[in-house]
Amino acid sequence: MLSARSAQCMVSMATRSCVSRGSAGSAAAGPVEAAIRAKLEQALSPEVLELRNESGGHAVPAGSETHFRVAVVSSRFEGMSPLQRHRLVHEALSEELAGPVHALAIQAKTPAQWRENPQLDISPPCLGGSKKTRGTS
């Protein structure tokens, strides 16, 4: 059974985009999120592009755009290894990864793979932060 979130994304396949907000998300995408979405759409012509800003779950200021999770579904991934798929995503986002983006979790799937499991994975809780918050000095 599909969750409401997955059902929304399946409906969104017709428009090739899926609106998603993480714990740091707001009603409108920030400039980094917008750039990531535009660059992946241009580079990969995805059938599904689901992007979640997960910065709010990390030790960063409110409203940050530093930690993202993306599910990108493209026929361009056919016949490629997971490493090759991730390299395509990294190539498209080289500016963001060299600057404002600290972490990017990637699910790069073919359309057939997405149909088998049409959902964006959930990240585990952040265990990072300053050394003082981890109990060391």
UniProtKB/Swiss-Prot annotation:
Top-rank taxon, per record: Eukaryota
TM region(s), chain numbering: none
Keyword terms, alphabetized: Mitochondrion, Phosphoprotein
Region of interest: Disordered: 115-137
Record's signal peptide: none
Record-listed Phosphoserine modification sites: S81
UniProt similarity note: Belongs to the BolA/IbaG family.
Protein's UniProt name: BolA-like protein 1
